[in-house]
Swiss-Prot record:
Gene3D superfamilies: 3.30.60.20, P-loop containing nucleotide triphosphate hydrolases (3.40.50.300)
Protein localization: Cytoplasm
A biological process term (GO) from this entry: thymidine metabolic process
Protein's name according to its UniProt entry: Thymidine kinase
Binding residues annotated for Zn(2+), in chain numbering: C139, C142, C177, H180
Reactions it catalyzes: thymidine + ATP = dTMP + ADP + H(+)
GO CC terms in record: cytoplasm
Main location: cytoplasm
Active-site residue numbers: E84
One protein family per Pfam: TK
Gene from which the chain derives: tdk
Keyword Mitochondrion among UniProt keywords: no
Chain positions recorded as ATP binding sites: G7, P8, M9, F10, A11, G12, K13, T14, D83, E84, I85, Q86
Single GO MF annotation: ATP binding
Protein backbone atom coordinates (compact mmCIF):
# COMPACT_ATOMS: atom_id res chain seq x y z
CA UNK A 1 0.00 0.00 0.00
CA UNK A 2 1.29 3.45 -0.93
CA UNK A 3 0.08 6.45 1.09
CA UNK A 4 1.19 9.89 -0.09
CA UNK A 5 0.78 12.88 2.24
CA UNK A 6 0.82 16.26 0.49
CA UNK A 7 0.16 19.91 1.17
CA UNK A 8 1.91 23.25 1.60
CA UNK A 9 4.55 24.02 4.18
CA UNK A 10 3.29 24.06 7.78
CA UNK A 11 0.40 21.68 7.00
CA UNK A 12 1.69 18.88 9.25
CA UNK A 13 2.92 16.44 6.58
CA UNK A 14 5.95 15.26 8.54
CA UNK A 15 3.92 15.08 11.75
CA UNK A 16 1.41 12.84 9.98
CA UNK A 17 4.19 10.67 8.51
CA UNK A 18 5.75 10.20 11.97
CA UNK A 19 2.34 9.47 13.52
CA UNK A 20 1.63 6.75 10.97
CA UNK A 21 5.08 5.16 11.28
CA UNK A 22 4.85 5.12 15.09
CA UNK A 23 1.50 3.28 14.90
CA UNK A 24 3.12 0.49 12.87
CA UNK A 25 6.15 0.33 15.18
CA UNK A 26 3.85 -0.01 18.22
CA UNK A 27 2.14 -2.89 16.37
CA UNK A 28 5.50 -4.66 16.01
CA UNK A 29 6.22 -3.83 12.37
CA UNK A 30 9.79 -3.19 11.25
CA UNK A 31 9.97 0.36 9.89
CA UNK A 32 12.60 2.48 8.21
CA UNK A 33 12.41 6.22 7.54
CA UNK A 34 14.46 8.12 4.97
CA UNK A 35 15.11 11.83 4.54
CA UNK A 36 17.16 13.78 1.98
CA UNK A 37 20.59 14.98 3.12
CA UNK A 38 19.86 18.57 2.14
CA UNK A 39 17.10 18.87 4.77
CA UNK A 40 19.07 19.98 7.82
CA UNK A 41 16.63 22.61 9.12
CA UNK A 42 15.79 21.09 12.51
CA UNK A 43 17.91 17.94 12.85
CA UNK A 44 20.53 16.50 10.52
CA UNK A 45 19.88 12.85 11.46
CA UNK A 46 16.14 12.74 12.15
CA UNK A 47 12.93 13.47 10.34
CA UNK A 48 11.79 16.60 12.17
CA UNK A 49 8.50 18.48 12.01
CA UNK A 50 8.07 22.23 12.51
CA UNK A 51 6.37 21.47 15.85
CA UNK A 52 9.50 19.74 17.21
CA UNK A 53 8.36 16.13 16.73
CA UNK A 54 11.29 13.92 15.60
CA UNK A 55 11.92 10.35 14.44
CA UNK A 56 15.21 8.58 13.63
CA UNK A 57 15.94 8.51 9.91
CA UNK A 58 18.49 7.32 7.39
CA UNK A 59 19.89 10.40 5.70
CA UNK A 60 20.54 9.82 2.01
CA UNK A 61 21.51 11.89 -1.03
CA UNK A 62 18.50 13.18 -2.99
CA UNK A 63 19.71 11.65 -6.24
CA UNK A 64 19.56 8.36 -8.16
CA UNK A 65 21.93 6.74 -5.64
CA UNK A 66 19.55 7.73 -2.85
CA UNK A 67 16.63 6.19 -4.74
CA UNK A 68 18.60 2.92 -5.05
CA UNK A 69 19.34 2.97 -1.31
CA UNK A 70 15.61 3.35 -0.61
CA UNK A 71 14.79 0.54 -3.05
CA UNK A 72 17.35 -1.90 -1.57
CA UNK A 73 17.08 -1.09 2.14
CA UNK A 74 13.31 -0.64 1.97
CA UNK A 75 12.84 -4.18 0.66
CA UNK A 76 14.01 -5.49 4.07
CA UNK A 77 11.27 -3.72 6.08
CA UNK A 78 7.51 -3.95 6.62
CA UNK A 79 7.06 -0.18 6.55
CA UNK A 80 9.05 2.29 4.44
CA UNK A 81 8.64 6.05 4.89
CA UNK A 82 10.24 8.88 2.93
CA UNK A 83 9.94 12.54 3.89
CA UNK A 84 10.42 15.53 1.58
CA UNK A 85 9.94 13.44 -1.57
CA UNK A 86 9.87 16.56 -3.76
CA UNK A 87 13.67 16.80 -3.41
CA UNK A 88 14.27 13.39 -5.00
CA UNK A 89 14.37 12.55 -8.72
CA UNK A 90 11.12 11.37 -10.28
CA UNK A 91 12.46 7.77 -10.26
CA UNK A 92 11.63 7.74 -6.55
CA UNK A 93 7.91 7.51 -7.38
CA UNK A 94 8.52 4.30 -9.34
CA UNK A 95 10.62 2.85 -6.52
CA UNK A 96 7.90 3.64 -3.97
CA UNK A 97 5.28 2.08 -6.24
CA UNK A 98 7.34 -1.13 -6.47
CA UNK A 99 8.05 -1.24 -2.74
CA UNK A 100 4.31 -0.89 -2.04
CA UNK A 101 3.79 -4.41 -3.37
CA UNK A 102 4.04 -6.34 -0.13
CA UNK A 103 4.68 -3.56 2.37
CA UNK A 104 3.35 -0.26 3.66
CA UNK A 105 4.97 2.79 2.04
CA UNK A 106 4.34 6.28 3.40
CA UNK A 107 5.66 9.31 1.53
CA UNK A 108 5.30 12.99 2.37
CA UNK A 109 6.11 16.08 0.39
CA UNK A 110 5.10 19.38 -1.10
CA UNK A 111 2.75 19.03 -4.03
CA UNK A 112 3.39 22.58 -5.32
CA UNK A 113 6.52 24.72 -5.39
CA UNK A 114 6.58 28.43 -4.47
CA UNK A 115 5.60 29.25 -8.06
CA UNK A 116 2.43 27.20 -7.68
CA UNK A 117 3.70 24.50 -10.05
CA UNK A 118 3.61 20.75 -9.27
CA UNK A 119 6.71 18.94 -8.09
CA UNK A 120 7.09 16.10 -10.60
CA UNK A 121 8.15 13.44 -8.08
CA UNK A 122 5.23 14.19 -5.78
CA UNK A 123 2.76 14.31 -8.67
CA UNK A 124 3.92 10.91 -9.97
CA UNK A 125 3.81 9.37 -6.49
CA UNK A 126 0.27 10.70 -6.07
CA UNK A 127 -0.73 9.02 -9.34
CA UNK A 128 0.54 5.64 -8.04
CA UNK A 129 -0.88 6.08 -4.52
CA UNK A 130 -3.54 3.86 -3.01
CA UNK A 131 -4.40 6.80 -0.80
CA UNK A 132 -3.56 10.50 -1.03
CA UNK A 133 -3.90 12.59 2.11
CA UNK A 134 -4.08 16.26 1.19
CA UNK A 135 -3.47 18.52 4.18
CA UNK A 136 -3.91 22.27 4.43
CA UNK A 137 -2.16 24.77 6.66
CA UNK A 138 -3.57 28.05 7.99
CA UNK A 139 -3.19 31.17 5.86
CA UNK A 140 -0.78 33.55 7.56
CA UNK A 141 -2.83 36.54 6.37
CA UNK A 142 -6.47 35.60 6.98
CA UNK A 143 -6.57 32.34 8.96
CA UNK A 144 -8.47 30.37 6.31
CA UNK A 145 -7.25 26.99 4.98
CA UNK A 146 -3.96 27.43 3.10
CA UNK A 147 -3.07 25.26 0.12
CA UNK A 148 -0.10 27.23 -1.20
CA UNK A 149 3.44 28.01 -0.05
CA UNK A 150 4.57 31.62 -0.50
CA UNK A 151 8.34 32.18 -0.56
CA UNK A 152 9.36 35.57 0.80
CA UNK A 153 12.51 37.62 0.36
CA UNK A 154 12.64 40.52 2.82
CA UNK A 155 8.90 40.13 3.38
CA UNK A 156 8.02 40.31 -0.33
CA UNK A 157 6.99 37.38 -2.56
CA UNK A 158 10.06 35.93 -4.29
CA UNK A 159 10.32 36.43 -8.07
CA UNK A 160 9.64 33.51 -10.40
CA UNK A 161 13.30 33.28 -11.49
CA UNK A 162 14.44 32.49 -7.91
CA UNK A 163 15.90 28.99 -7.44
CA UNK A 164 13.18 26.36 -7.18
CA UNK A 165 14.77 24.72 -4.12
CA UNK A 166 15.64 26.81 -1.08
CA UNK A 167 15.72 25.03 2.26
CA UNK A 168 14.04 27.12 4.91
CA UNK A 169 11.29 27.48 7.45
CA UNK A 170 9.07 30.30 8.62
CA UNK A 171 11.85 32.83 7.96
CA UNK A 172 11.53 32.20 4.20
CA UNK A 173 8.03 30.81 3.66
CA UNK A 174 4.40 31.38 4.61
CA UNK A 175 1.32 29.26 4.12
CA UNK A 176 -1.28 31.11 2.06
CA UNK A 177 -4.84 30.52 0.90
CA UNK A 178 -5.62 30.78 -2.81
CA UNK A 179 -6.88 34.35 -2.35
CA UNK A 180 -3.71 35.64 -0.64
CA UNK A 181 -1.16 33.61 -2.58
CA UNK A 182 0.77 35.92 -4.92
CA UNK A 183 1.84 34.26 -8.17
CA UNK A 184 5.53 35.17 -8.53
CA UNK A 185 6.13 37.81 -11.21
Amino acid sequence: MLVVIVGPMFAGKTTELIRRVERYVIAGRRAIVFKPSLDVRYDASKVAAHNGLKFDAFVIPPDKDGVEIIRKMGAEYDVVAVDEIQFFPVDLADALNQLANGRIVIAAGLNLDFRGEPFETTARAMAFADRVISLSAVCKLCGKPATRTQRLINGVPAPRHSPRILIGGNESYEARCRRHYVIPP
